[in-house]
Swiss-Prot record:
<feature type="repeat" description="Kelch 3">
    <location>
        <begin position="441"/>
        <end position="488"/>
    </location>
</feature>
<dbReference type="GO" id="GO:0060297">
    <property type="term" value="P:regulation of sarcomere organization"/>
</dbReference>
<dbReference type="Pfam" id="PF07707">
    <property type="entry name" value="BACK"/>
</dbReference>
<dbReference type="InterPro" id="IPR011705">
    <property type="entry name" value="BACK"/>
</dbReference>
<dbReference type="GO" id="GO:0045214">
    <property type="term" value="P:sarcomere organization"/>
</dbReference>
<dbReference type="GO" id="GO:0048741">
    <property type="term" value="P:skeletal muscle fiber development"/>
</dbReference>
<feature type="domain" description="BTB">
    <location>
        <begin position="32"/>
        <end position="102"/>
    </location>
</feature>
<keyword id="KW-0703">Sarcoplasmic reticulum</keyword>
<dbReference type="GO" id="GO:0043161">
    <property type="term" value="P:proteasome-mediated ubiquitin-dependent protein catabolic process"/>
</dbReference>
<dbReference type="GO" id="GO:0031463">
    <property type="term" value="C:Cul3-RING ubiquitin ligase complex"/>
</dbReference>
<dbReference type="InterPro" id="IPR017096">
    <property type="entry name" value="BTB-kelch_protein"/>
</dbReference>
<keyword id="KW-0256">Endoplasmic reticulum</keyword>
<dbReference type="InterPro" id="IPR000210">
    <property type="entry name" value="BTB/POZ_dom"/>
</dbReference>
<dbReference type="Pfam" id="PF24681">
    <property type="entry name" value="Kelch_KLHDC2_KLHL20_DRC7"/>
</dbReference>
<feature type="domain" description="BACK">
    <location>
        <begin position="137"/>
        <end position="239"/>
    </location>
</feature>
<feature type="repeat" description="Kelch 5">
    <location>
        <begin position="537"/>
        <end position="591"/>
    </location>
</feature>
<dbReference type="GO" id="GO:0036269">
    <property type="term" value="P:swimming behavior"/>
</dbReference>
Length: 599
């Protein structure tokens, strides 16, 4: 055993022994030399324990020079305290056990703060930090400030900053006083993509109590980053605001801001020390971007090692999350709410003798680089595809992992209820198809039947009517192809059919219900990932046929990235080899590059 481990065991043993002994002495009423009078209750305890755990009680029993007060009363009267709460705290000091709940945490916190009992105070802080939610974070932020607990206030502020766009719509936000409000809107960590939202919330807050709050606008200006606003917005919305126009001091500040837009910053006063950095300019000229302004539309590649985000504009890669638990050959989907779900894959649980084949289901945590395990799919399958409608995710058809037969069943996952159900079956059994979600419908395109016949059919599912409707068929039957919605049309790329690999592409017009020829891909390829990112169409990785060392033609994985050039109507190669694309599914997702390590 390591020396440190031995020391830790000895310390823990001694602490437990001491705690149990003190608890026994209290229970047997031995050496009791203090009575806490709380309301109609009398709580026996030991001075030694109370003084050791609380500076408040230490002052009752000792003078400033540390001499024990001989005349200190045995009975200590505690005013305006709930006796049940104080009893809980005293028991905690002897047992290290306390039942903190949503109902009592505020009262326990207040009493621990009043009598300076840091151990109980810390327990409450930990509890509240773990309980932070959209419903309570504003109140917890205020509590942290009122009780002078920076750790809690900062945790709550950071939570508010992360969910700023949602919480800014809450009327409670407008009840903050000026220092509370400014502490939030001045935060670098605000998850806001446009400074306009911060300014508009400020003016809404002012107008809530115009008579008193208009006077605080001068200070409030220090927390708005006007240089991050579009110049047109500054002229039309800020300068023309009636409250701002009526204040001469604000007009002067706007003049300085307009000069800054023109490239003229105020001169640094003589005598100021060099290197003061951000203190050189007034706050309203701060042009540091908020955290949310680092959000970008990225190509996210998920394989059984990691989820890596690629910024095609900057040619940079970022680690979104490690992904050792994600099986190969899974299916991924990004919802309209920008949430990533990963389902299926080839995984055999050898310890589960009854059901060794598993179809796991994960969501990437939007606030941390972790995966959240969700209820697994009830019927293990592969070669299926996923779509969505409102708060529902659909796993359409595929191949049963046990029987190896194609399926027509459609599984439906309710995101709110966290439950899988089965919905209206597809009109035929297929696998290797693609699914697209658009205009409130789920489109199932192409695929292959158990008779090894590739199809060109397309069906649209209306969940409200619980019906599948056949629409215009593709010009070319295909399976194992890429598909996405780009500029209002479905674009399909490559795939395979009875004639072999395909390089042909097609586009579907929702308005006319017609397919048209799209620019041919540069290479015959199957299993290609096709995605539209920030208005640009990309094709990532896939399989083609290559000649090996033995001069045999075999399937070979390609990990390149192609971009479609709209003006030239052709595909152009961007990257010859993207190692993170190997074995990966790819989706378009908006992520914050400031929160991810750069690779």
């Amino acid at each position: 055993m390591e020396p440190m481990s031995v020391k830790e065991d000895l310390r823990l043993f001694q602490s437990t022994l001491l705690q149990d002994g003190l608890k026994e002495l209290l229970k047997e009423n031995k050496f009791v030399d203090c009575i806490l009078k709380v309301g109609d209750r009398s709580l026996p305890c030991h001075r030694l324990i109370m003084a050791a755990c609380s500076p408040y009680f230490r002052e009752l029993y000792f003078t400033e020079d540390g001499t024990e007060k001989k005349d200190a009363n045995k009975e200590v009267v505690l005013e305006n305290v709930d006796p049940n709460i104080m009893d809980m705290i005293v028991n905690y000091l002897y047992s290290a056990d306390i039942d903190i709940t949503d109902d009592n945490v505020q009262d326990v916190f207040a009493v621990a703060n009043k009598f300076q009992i840091p151990s109980v105070f810390t327990v409450c802080v930990n509890y509240l930090q773990n309980k932070l939610s959209l419903g309570n974070c504003l109140a917890i932020f205020r509590m942290g400030l009122v009780l002078n607990c920076p750790r809690l206030a900062v945790s709550a502020r950071d939570f508010i900053a992360e969910h700023f766009e949602t919480l800014s719509k809450d009327e409670e936000f407008l009840e903050f006083n000026a220092p509370e409000f400014f502490a939030i809107i001045g935060c670098d960590a605000l998850n806001v993509e446009k400074e306009e939202l911060v300014f508009e919330l400020l003016m809404k807050w002012v107008r809530k109590n115009k008579e008193n709050r208009a006077k605080a606008l001068g200070d409030a200006f220090e927390h708005i980053r006007f240089r991050l606003l579009p110049e047109k917005y500054l002229k039309e919305k800020v300068e023309k605001d009636d409250i701002i126009k009526a204040d001469p001091e604000l007009i002067k500040k706007l003049k300085v801001i307009k000069d800054a837009f023109a490239g003229k910053l105020p001169q640094i006063k003589e005598g100021e020390k060099e290197g003061e950095g951000e203190n050189e300019l007034p706050g309203f000229l701060n042009d540091s971007q908020r955290l949310g302004m680092f959000n970008r539309d990225l190509i996210l590649m998920i394989n059984d090692t990691a989820a890596v985000a690629y910024d095609a504009n900057e040619n940079e890669c970022f680690l979104a999350a490690m992904a050792e638990q994600i099986p190969r050959n899974h299916v991924s989907i990004t919802s309209k709410k920008n949430l990533l779900y990963v389902a299926g894959g080839l995984f055999v649980d050898e310890e589960n003798k009854d059901s060794p084949l598993q179809c796991y289901f994960y969501q990437m945590d939007p606030h941390s680089p972790n995966w959240i395990a969700l209820p697994p799919m009830p019927s293990p399958r592969c070669l299926f595809a996923m779509g969505e409608f409102e708060n529902l995710l659909f796993a359409v058809a595929g191949k049963d992992l046990q029987s190896n037969e194609s399926l027509d069943s459609v599984l439906c996952y309710d995101v709110d209820k966290m439950k899988w159900l089965e919905t209206k079956k597809l009109p035929l059994r297929i696998h290797g198809h693609s699914v697209i979600s658009q205009n409130g419908l789920v489109y199932c395109i192409g695929g292959k039947t158990d008779e090894n016949k590739t199809i060109n059919k397309m069906f649209a599912y209306n969940h409200k009517k619980s019906e599948w409707k056949e629409l215009a068929a593709m010009k070319t039957p295909r399976s194992m192809f890429g598909a996405t919605v780009h500029k209002g049309k479905i674009v399909v790329v490559g795939g395979v059919n009875e004639d072999g690999l395909l390089s042909s592409c097609e586009a579907y017009d929702f308005g006319t219900n017609k397919w048209e020829v799209f620019a041919e891909f540069a290479q015959e390829r199957s299993s290609v990932n096709v995605l539209s990112v920030d208005g640009v169409l990309y094709a990532v990785a896939g399989f083609t046929i290559k000649e090996n060392e033995d001069k045999q033609c075999v399937p070979s994985e390609i990990t390149d990235i192609w971009q479609y050039e709209e003006d030239k109507k052709q595909w152009s190669g961007m990257i010859g080899e993207m190692r993170y694309a190997s074995g990966a599914s790819c989706v378009s997702m908006r992520l914050n590059v400031a929160k991810m390590p750069k690779l």
